[in-house]
From Swiss-Prot:
InterPro entries named in the record: DUF1328
Membrane topology category: Multi-pass membrane protein
Major localization class: membrane
Protein name: UPF0391 membrane protein PFLU_0090
Annotated TM spans: 4-24, 29-49
Keywords: Cell membrane, Membrane, Transmembrane, Transmembrane helix
Pfam family, one: DUF1328
Record GO cellular component, one term: plasma membrane
UniProt source species: Pseudomonas fluorescens (strain SBW25)
Family listed: Belongs to the UPF0391 family.
Location(s) in or outside the cell: Cell membrane
Length: 54
């Protein structure tokens, strides 16, 4: 699950770079939302994944 969160976080960062660069101006808002959502998912996966192994 952690690998999925990292994958989607990278996708959100790429979308943000493209959106902020002016290539897709309307994608800026979507990229911001995706970045926050997947950052939260990454942090949650990191902590819950570590707790399950102990």
């Amino acid at each position: 699950m952690l690998s999925w969160a990292i994958t989607f976080l990278i996708i959100a960062i790429v979308a943000a770079v493209l959106g902020f660069g002016g290539i897709a101006g309307t994608a800026t808002g979507i990229a911001k939302i995706l970045f926050v959502v997947f950052l939260v998912m990454f942090i949650a996966s990191f902590f819950f994944g570590r707790r399950g192994r102990g």
